């Protein structure tokens, strides 16, 4: 999954939930995890057997640690869901060439030199403002689980196959 900005409007949470429901109904997350090939830490391919998944259980149950499930997504399904395009997420078969910009102003299309800019005084003081955490801009490629915006544990997909391959 590649993060990028697109010129389409922002998504509401309901439309994204609807898209996820459509993916689920299309058979991506059924009660069984199909046979998959997964790469182990030493680079060898192994075949993962079918495993029964309990409702609400993590989809990679039965998969060795360090490997992630591979989910096949029909390209036609994604074409039908164009209205669910997110300004922050783009599904792509290619790895990103560079990390996403931290701020919208770093986008080349947004940088318009003729636009008016607000002037700031030199030596601007920041009284009472303290950094809560360090900002880090980098691609994370080794995560297998994460916490969503509602605080629920979710599985991060390592690969999404598109098309009939």
Curated annotation (Swiss-Prot):
Residues 1-3 form the signal peptide. Residues 4-119 form a propeptide. Glycans are attached at residue 112. One of its GO terms (molecular function) is growth factor activity. InterPro entries: Cystine-knot_cytokine, Nerve_growth_factor-like, Nerve_growth_factor-rel, NTF3_N. Keywords: Cleavage on pair of basic residues, Glycoprotein, Growth factor, Secreted, Signal. It is found in: Secreted. Seems to promote the survival of visceral and proprioceptive sensory neurons. Belongs to the NGF-beta family. This is Neurotrophin-3. It comes from Morelia spilota.
